[in-house]
């Protein structure tokens, strides 16, 4: 049986519990806390967030059918919508790893409102998976945010968006050391 007691409390003294005081863990000379993690998440320091969490920050959801624009641009995406209560990093593009049915895939993810193609305020997570061509609508997926690439941008036209997705994909492929 494991018990705990407040240091110096009557229960500790009466039951002769042994109290061990453990120093707080630190990372980069700062005490690890939920506040520290939220601060780092708020500014998109994903590498630090992932170290502090001891796992990658993730968004989980069921794949929904989008407007199919990514497919028309030769960058088909899987789209999920985080709950309104999910604390998220800044809107932007991230190098990500996505798990579908236990299998992992690398890709790039836009977290945000898609300002080039939509005026809607709804936040979505749109992920282009490298070397992937499966129908996963209705499946639960887990998107792990590994590295912040750049802030979300509004492009003058979809051709500019397409060029930037290609550049973001090249960056992420190089980062993940895949062709």
Predicted regions and their residues:
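Short, conserved beta-strand edge motifs with alternating hydrophobic and charged residues
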Residues: 22, 52, 60-62, 97, ...
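A short, charged helix-loop
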Residues: 14-25, 32
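Single conserved hydrophobic/aromatic residue that forms the stacking wall/gate
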Residues: 1-8, 12-13
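Long, positively charged amphipathic alpha-helical accessory segments at protein N-termini or as interdomain linkers
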Residues: 10, 14-19, 56, 100-101, ...
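Generic anion/oxyanion-binding catalytic loop in active/binding sites
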Residues: 1, 26, 38, 85, ...
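Anionic-ligand-binding alpha/beta catalytic cores of soluble enzymes and soluble regulatory domains
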Residues: 25, 30-74, 78
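Phosphate/ribose-recognition catalytic cores of enzymes acting on nucleotide-derived substrates
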Residues: 65-179
């Amino acid at each position: 049986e494991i018990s705990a007691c407040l240091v110096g409390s009557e229960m500790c003294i009466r039951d002769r519990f042994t109290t061990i005081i453990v120093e707080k863990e630190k990372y980069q000379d700062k005490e690890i806390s939920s506040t520290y993690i939220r601060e780092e998440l708020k500014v998109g320091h994903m590498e630090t967030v992932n170290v502090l969490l001891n796992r990658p920050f993730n968004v989980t959801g069921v794949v929904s059918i989008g407007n199919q624009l990514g497919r028309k641009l030769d960058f088909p995406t899987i789209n999920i919508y985080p709950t309104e209560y999910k604390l998220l990093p800044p809107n932007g593009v991230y190098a990500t790893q996505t798990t579908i049915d236990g299998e992992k895939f690398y890709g790039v993810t836009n977290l945000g409102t898609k300002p080039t193609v939509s005026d809607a305020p709804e936040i979505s997570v749109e992920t282009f998976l490298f070397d992937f061509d499966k129908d996963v609508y209705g499946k639960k997926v887990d998107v792990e945010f590994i590295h912040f690439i750049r802030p979300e941008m509004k492009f003058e036209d979809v051709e500019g968006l397409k060029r930037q997705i290609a550049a973001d994909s090249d960056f992420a492929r190089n980062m993940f050391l895949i062709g």
